[in-house]
Amino acid sequence: MSNRPNNNPGGSLRRSQRNTAGAQPQDDSIGGRSCSSSSAVIVPQPEDPDRANTSERQKTGQVPKKDNSRGVKRSASPDYNRTNSPSSAKKPRAFQHIESFSETNKPHSKSKKRHLDQEQQLKSAQLPSTSKAHTRKSVAAGSSRNQKRKRTESSCVKSGSGSESTGAEERSAKPIKLASKSATSAKAGCSTITDSSSAASTSSSSSAIASASSTVPAGARVKQGKDQNKARRSRSASSPSPRRSSREKEQSKTGGSSKFDWAARFSPKVSLPKTKLSLPGSSKSETSKPGPSGLQAKLASLRKSTKKRSESPPAELPSLRRSTRQKTTGSCASTSRRGSGLGKRGAAEARRQEKMADPESNQETVNSSAARTDEAPQGAAASSSVAGAVGMTTSGESESDDSEMGRLQALLEARGLPPHLFGPLGPRMSQLFHRTIGSGASSKAQQLLQGLQASDESQQLQAVIEMCQLLVMGNEETLGGFPVKSVVPALITLLQMEHNFDIMNHACRALTYMMEALPRSSAVVVDAIPVFLEKLQVIQCIDVAEQALTALEMLSRRHSKAILQAGGLADCLLYLEFFSINAQRNALAIAANCCQSITPDEFHFVADSLPLLTQRLTHQDKKSVESTCLCFARLVDNFQHEENLLQQVASKDLLTNVQQLLVVTPPILSSGMFIMVVRMFSLMCSNCPTLAVQLMKQNIAETLHFLLCGASNGSCQEQIDLVPRSPQELYELTSLICELMPCLPKEGIFAVDTMLKKGNAQNTDGAIWQWRDDRGLWHPYNRIDSRIIEAAHQVGEDEISLSTLGRVYTIDFNSMQQINEDTGTARAIQRKPNPLANSNTSGYSELKKDDARAQLMKEDPELAKSFIKTLFGVLYEVYSSSAGPAVRHKCLRAILRIIYFADAELLKDVLKNHAVSSHIASMLSSQDLKIVVGALQMAEILMQKLPDIFSVYFRREGVMHQVKHLAESESLLTSPPKACTNGSGSLGSTTPASSGTATAATNASADLGSPSLQHSRDDSLDLSPQGRLSDVLKRKRLPKRGPRRPKYSPPRDDDKVDNQAKSPTTTQSPKSSFLASLNPKTWGRLSAQSNSNNIEPARTAGVSGLARAASKDTISNNREKIKGWIKEQAHKFVERYFSSENMDGSNPALNVLQRLCAATEQLNLQVDGGAECLVEIRSIVSESDVSSFEIQHSGFVKQLLLYLTSKNEKDAVGREIRLKRFLHVFFSSPLPGEEPVGRVEPVGHAPLLALVHKMNNCLSQMEQFPVKVHDFPSGNGAGGSFSLNRGSQALKFFNTHQLKCQLQRHPDCANVKQWKGGPVKIDPLALVQAIERYLVVRGYGRVREDDEDSDDDGSDEEIDESLAAQFLNSGNVRHRLQFYIGEHLLPYNMTVYQAVRQFSVQAEDERESTDDESNPLGRAGIWTKTHTIWYKPVREDEESTKDCVGGKRGRAQTAPTKTSPRNAKKHDELWHDGVCPSVANPLEVYLIPTPPENITFEDPSLDVILLLRVLHAISRYWYYLYDNAMCKEIIPTSEFINSKLTAKANRQLQDPLVIMTGNIPTWLTELGKTCPFFFPFDTRQMLFYVTAFDRDRAMQRLLDTNPEINQSDSQDSRVAPRLDRKKRTVNREELLKQAESVMQDLGSSRAMLEIQYENEVGTGLGPTLEFYALVSQELQRADLCLWRGEEVTLSNPKGSQEGTKYIQNLQGLFALPFGRTAKPAHIAKVKMKFRFLGKLMAKAIMDFRLVDLPLGLPFYKWMLRQETSLTSHDLFDIDPVVARSVYHLEDIVRQKKRLEQDKSQTKESLQYALETLTMNGCSVEDLGLDFTLPGFPNIELKKGGKDIPVTIHNLEEYLRLVIFWALNEGVCRQFDSFRDGFESVFPLCHLQYFYPEELDQLLCGSKADTWDAKTLMECCRPDHGYTHDSRAVKFLFEILSSFDNEQQRLFLQFVTGSPRLPVGGFRSLNPPLTIVRKTFESTENPDDFLPSVMTCVNYLKLPDYSSIDIMRDKLLIAAREGQQSFHLS
């Protein structure tokens, strides 16, 4: 990260690069995104082996123990079958992907155990001095750091969930010290460099912990994580130290092997599945293990011995080593099956006995599990998803952990130590490493404990201070065996010493640090709650009170119930205003946590605090406000069924304050919090109509209008422009509008809605399941888990496996217990009937008699009228512009309510500006049942209320036509069509909209992705089942109790029904599973459930994934009933309203249609109808309101398309004449043959514009492009972190599941090894090339000679070190193997999932019952079957093509170069005869009546698309039809944009799942390239990034443009983008030379390039952006001879190259031409520079960087291969002076031609006339021109050109040659080199999404424009001491808005590193520009200091200057002087 500091008053200014958190302002809001991911000591996270390694065997304990396990999930289950394996060193990411599963397990021999135990004791006894010395050193080191820790602890420096790169910056703070330490102290330093990002990602103590870890380097507590070792250590102080003994065993195995490193890197351990014969219920496996009694004996003796020698480090009892269960984070990971082990309950029983044998251990286990309520399923009171929403996470168990060895290795490798040295060194280093760190901690703690219990207060104070130091420097690793249960009571005693504030403060602090360092200790610290609260009730010392708040805040994350029931909520808020801001935040966070699972019985605890919390909403502090909002949202969520409580919570002040909060500009609330607050309002309105009435009276309509459309400018009815909002925000806002209106009735036309809800045979919401924690409290499971358990219970399962939050539990129905499969912890469960399950609490289908909203409509019609007028248009616009099905359905319901309750006059008023009829027509043609039903209902209401108007419109717009079609259709909606219409989209008709809630008190779920308490609404399409696919699928494991059931374990009924629903002939088979049942298409696209308009908030039990066990009959009955209803309703509709229609066609509504048909018939190609028919069409289009339906049904589109494009000999009139006629009629250009003498200029384009708009309307109505989105609301009520959409839940699914593949040698080849490793499990999102790497480094890529041995050469585990190194170090390895599924060759860059999905046999089988749109995760078969992938070597002759098929780059074929043989002839003609090729007319390409080759999709709107394509081409290139026309497009391209297609494209491109699987619909990419004009630039730019590069870049781009996705849980998973970064250091003095070298090395690498400058500490985004800007400047140097233009000397603010000349061309740079006689050496040099430029530009685009090159338009035309159509018009863009001369000379040529064509001229008069043709009074001969290029006398236009004068007779040839040489021939060699360089990075064909004039935006960012204060206020973020109201911020905005172009560039380069902003300006700057206050000592004057910056995060540290003039001066000085240096501030 790069700081540009300028805090020295006058002199040398430096820009700073501070990577410590301390450099950042002391708050946690910076934590979002930061730039630098490294300093010298950082090894990128993805290279961690164990992240990629989740496996079935790990889940059961058959995993070899890995030392450097990161992200390890600790599991306490003993595994007696395990072999030790060598400690894995780090594997590169390429090999994390795949592991085979096969490893035999051997029991340990007892003698070996004893021997190792003795050896361990002996060794540990030998190093006492080392460990003591180290302990002293670390404590001493800690004390000074501790002071810093104390200062910053309450203002969390970093949010715990900061990005990885942020953590890296912090870590890189002190690299130099580390290098100089001894091995021992390197350990301490090394732990500083642990991966704080992974720890923080799920750290239970996020903000505060991160604060400590970032400010306290050595021995940092960055890992509170856990692995298998820590589980034991913190459970029992006397338990052995596993790491040491395991390392010694590893050492004995790997001691001297130099292969250690590679073997560990590239050979993940493999375990073969053992056959097992365990009977059901058996609790023993075949291998002998110590029984429970043996365990007890061992434990007892061990405990005695450790008590005797508590000073010496204990050894480990190998048989008690725990298995690990790791989070998979690579791209492919292997898994093996569960081993037999003990039966689930048997193992648990053994563990329980083992624990009972050791009372202390047992007690601690109980306590620790009580502490970790997150270990239980998600319903826990301490659920982490809720905390996630406000940046608090609670899971201690899922924290990542780097082993120290891994960190040391990372450090030393970064310092240049060869990795292979780690082979022999590894075990010894790690052994030394551990001995020094762990030995002293527990003995030290025991000494301090005695001090705490002493009688002397000074001794106690000293002890508690040292205890603080020990804890603040420690973590679970270093504090193994810390006596928590003894220390906590002692500290509580000290906390009660009221007279001694110091002791109290330190005791409180020690308890806080303890919870940070040992998260599970919070279960013991709970006892201190009453004492903490005492400190808040009577404040004696403010420090103690604030420290108590910090401690309580940490406790509240897991033990909020205990705090609430102790009255803690009120106590925390008692003296709120007296506390510092951080303490206030803590108090409000405690309040929010206490409300998390509050029940109605506990309301009295919070009631008195509500006024204070309500008032707090008006506060300015963002975090305080968000906590308060969270508090109310949780209350409303938990009390949603208690109307009286809701009214007490929602006082008038609350509604007013929240309303104001929503409209504050700039917004205080983040997107997630905004969604939560709006959802809270919806819940209130739907459950308590009186609150809805109150909101309407408070003018909520204006608020909503503002939120959707921005500030109103008075003409809201005329033009509605929606502000950009995420789909989730739109969904919530439309839900709220819907709930503000009364509910629809239940009878009449709406009766069908109730029918849609049926089909739920099994009521899985009928009961609530709860589990009991160790304190005896019952917690409900979240709703979806409760449903899963209930469904299994109902079908009589004995047990099910429930996977939640990354842990697996067995729910045993016989013993009513939940058993954690990893730890064996058993908890009681119970089933309670759900009182809400059968009552209709939603108020949906019955219009409650006392619905206050309906009363209001009657009593206050004016209010109702204004509400409807304000919002109807907005709703309509939301419907039209949204592609996501959920939003559209919700809008439809809201519109229906409005239309139903509005009276006729009002309706007439609000509908007059909207094309309602055409929308209804397109809705009726939809394939989505819900939409069709809604459209019929709407049509019926409108005809009842406004029959006169709509009887005409319904005829004209095609509604009648569609309704008749529905009424007559025999096969109504029977087969699901391929495409989904109108964006109701694939999932539009998905799972039914149940919004049931398990219980009012249900916890906001702890699973980030699963909806817990989704609030009621019409169609809150509850995707919880799909969202929890991971849980459901994990049940398909082989049960441990033997073959009781088949391999899959979903309840049998589900399977049965599933199959019946899919196809009646299918019998029950393992193929079916929940996943299948979750696919709506499997039970009929238009089934009853799929359209369950659970129209009002259906809080009743809905249809869940399990409830689809409804019988086939019910489902098909309902489907048939609804089809019947539609048909019957359509029939009635026609009878009622259109039966009396005159059949003679004389209806006045048909007049326009008849006129249009007549005119269309005259557009006949066989007969010349002149221009009259076009004139008639023009008048119809321009003057009448012809409808899309009429245009469609008149045949006009097809006929006009043929008229404009046909080039048939039989045509009566040629195409060019027809085109000119068309232009004449629609554009007023001259008629054919009547061209004027002067220039043809555009006159009026209104008729053409009207035609384009009509065509676009037609397209919107007809198109049926499917959108694969997953945008169902996934919010957990008000409780949690809101995933943006279901896509992130699906990502989570991919994160937890793998595809099983069998690798097989292809039958065609026998010259490579056969794979014998059995099936492998592969990450679905791994690329095919990952499998290649996996095989190649194991020798499978080596082609054998015939005489070599066959298959038995070497084991699968042998790694070819050279190949592995090659794969590691090079991004561009030659492919050795190719892969097939069946006959299909797989591209290397395709995901394995996509390959299997597209090509596997199973996929073929399943295609008839499922498709991509409806089920993104594929049928269950994909996940349960084994897919065969064949491999064979790449043949030599195929290698070149292989790159194209699937290499990373797939280079496009470049155009033939000018020197190729086929060009030789043309060259000669040009040189000898002066013949140059004619200019290509770009119109020709578009004038075709059929789709071009690259359009493969089918759609009803295809003809309209082709016509629009032709119209756009004519508008853009019309001047090619005329000799002398003005080069300007008729209609701006922006007028062709289709808003509906744009909405679909944007929605599609916001979906993370689609991007990760590369599953972009073909229509989108094809339209993007063939018809880019349909989409705005931003959309195409996103489409480009998604399709042109790897998916990591696409995901990164998505996260950059949609920050709210970052709030979802996808960030910490392995699907988060993992972009490799390569850092290079360059010297500023030789920048260009070194840049060329860097591009040569890394240009084509996939890694992101990061630049650092020599002797500067800055690294990351800022220096890298500056690198591109500076290299761009260097390339413009005049001495390089690259560009044409004038030489200027630029003032260089800094640097040594003063006086350097640069080329400047105001029109834009273009290549300097070469003649035929140019020196080859010079040409080669220039070509090399252009090749480098190509690489630089491509790399900049690829890495999202900007270059600062002002290139001309012709340059970009060359890039897009449009050079053949360059004309004299393009000369104006490179040399206007020459261009003007050429234009005048061309005028002479045109006059000459006219004279020659004049038949009346005689030879003499012609000769005379020609001689009088002059330019500025001079004849052509007098101009003295010769055949050389103007401005370049050395470049001859043809051979001997210097000696050929230009005359009137050869003038035309001369002009053609000048244009051709200047734009083509003279520059072709440079551009060929440029293209070669560019295409070495990625193919140029991907740029087809853009027009030439747009490439400047893509490459260089936004154009310079003035900055206005309003935009700056919206886009910039004041923080850390400043708000938008601060004087300094207002000064700054005023100054920036007055900057000129040069000052803007200076400022931007100073703050961001680049002189230009990205497209979109400040809005697109990522991270946003943040202005923070620069602080000084009280004696210092801010006016004496300069501002400084951190370029990586776009931070401007601005002193609070006394006046605006001083600020302006200081800013400009800093910006000028602070260039080109990155130093520490």
Swiss-Prot record:
The modification Phosphothreonine is found at T1410. Residues 154-166, 177-215, 379-397, 983-1006, 1062-1073 have a biased composition (Low complexity). Residues 1034-1047 have a biased composition (Basic residues). Residues 755-869 form the WWE domain. The active site is at C1992 (glycyl thioester intermediate). Residues 1-10, 18-27, 78-88, 119-132, 280-290, 326-338, 360-371 have a biased composition (Polar residues). Disruption phenotype: Embryonic lethality in the middle stage of development. Embryos exhibit growth arrest, while ES cells are viable. ES cells show decreased proliferation, but maintain both the undifferentiated state and the ability to differentiate. Its EC number is 2.3.2.26. Pathway: Protein modification; protein ubiquitination. It catalyses: S-ubiquitinyl-[E2 ubiquitin-conjugating enzyme]-L-cysteine + [acceptor protein]-L-lysine = [E2 ubiquitin-conjugating enzyme]-L-cysteine + N(6)-ubiquitinyl-[acceptor protein]-L-lysine. Residues 1-404, 970-1077, 1441-1466, 1601-1620 are annotated as: Disordered. The modification Phosphoserine is found at residues 12, 77, 85, 100, 310, 312, 975, 1024, 1030, 1049, 1063, 1350, 1355, 1362, 1409, 1460. E3 ubiquitin-protein ligase involved in ubiquitin fusion degradation (UFD) pathway and regulation of DNA repair. Part of the ubiquitin fusion degradation (UFD) pathway, a process that mediates ubiquitination of protein at their N-terminus, regardless of the presence of lysine residues in target proteins. Interacts with MYC; leading to disrupt interaction with isoform p19ARF/ARF of CDKN2A. Interacts with TRADD; leading to disrupt interaction with isoform p19ARF/ARF of CDKN2A. Interacts with SMARCC1; leading to disrupt interaction with SMARCE1. This is E3 ubiquitin-protein ligase TRIP12.
